[in-house]
Amino acid sequence: MMENPIKGRVWKFGNDIDTDVIIPGKYLRTKDMQVFAAHAMEGIDPGFSKKAKPGDIIVAGDNFGCGSSREQAPLALKHAGIACIVAKSFARIFFRNAINIGLPLMEADIECEEGDQIEVDLLKGEVKVSGKGVFRGNKLPDFLLDMLTDGGLVAHRKKVRDQEKEESA
């Protein structure tokens, strides 16, 4: 289930962070989420998984999640404890894969430094950065917010199906 607003410490990355950096290909044969978590961002910061704490937030530049369409990339970040990703832009398939697994994200161009505390309000489409102000982002459409609130696509479809069963009974 999604919390809102999402508050956390920033991990800052640049432009064109591809899925090979997020979770290197040599780990894709496993289905163990702890393996994914242990190797998240290994291609750019080998110690990331040991330093990241549950509730941390990634802030990045343009085209976050580009490259191959591996769904393991957002899974690795989610299981490493990342609560949200804010980027200037996302690769479309990464964006949808993140929504599908219930990993909140927002497109926004914000000013912050690694280690800053930020607050991401998905319902308002804004990010507050301690000591630096409030930045407007792209508010997600309601149907995507509903999916995130329910924990992702599968959980959302189950909820809708259960509601439909109740209504028809």
From Swiss-Prot:
SUPFAM superfamilies with a match to the protein in the record: LeuD/IlvD-like
Entry keywords, A to Z: Lyase
EC number(s) per entry: 4.2.1.114
The protein's annotated pathway: Organic acid metabolism; 2-oxosuberate biosynthesis
Disulfide bonds: none
Site (Critical for substrate specificity): 29
Biological processes annotated in GO: coenzyme B biosynthetic process
Enzyme class: lyase
Pfam families in alphabetical order: Aconitase_C
Catalytic activity: (2R)-homocitrate = (2R,3S)-homoisocitrate; (2R)-homocitrate = cis-homoaconitate + H2O; (2R,3S)-homoisocitrate = cis-homoaconitate + H2O; cis-(homo)2aconitate + H2O = (2R,3S)-iso(homo)2citrate
CDD domains the record matches: IPMI_Swivel (cd01577)
GO MF annotation: an example: homoaconitate hydratase activity
Motif position, YLRT: 27-30
Similarity section: Belongs to the LeuD family. LeuD type 2 subfamily.
Function: Component of a hydro-lyase with broad substrate specificity for cis-unsaturated tricarboxylic acids. Catalyzes both the reversible dehydration of (R)-homocitrate ((R)-2-hydroxybutane-1,2,4-tricarboxylate) to produce cis-homoaconitate ((Z)-but-1-ene-1,2,4-tricarboxylate), and its hydration to homoisocitrate ((1R,2S)-1-hydroxybutane-1,2,4-tricarboxylate). Is also able to hydrate the analogous longer chain substrates cis-homo(2)-aconitate, cis-homo(3)-aconitate. These reactions are part of the biosynthesis pathway of coenzyme B.
Record-linked NCBIfam families: LEUD_arch (TIGR02087)
HAMAP family on file: LeuD_type2 (MF_01032)
Subunit composition and interactions: Heterotetramer of 2 HacA and 2 HacB proteins.
Protein name in the entry: Methanogen homoaconitase small subunit
Organism: Methanosarcina mazei (strain ATCC BAA-159 / DSM 3647 / Goe1 / Go1 / JCM 11833 / OCM 88) (Methanosarcina frisia)
Gene: hacB
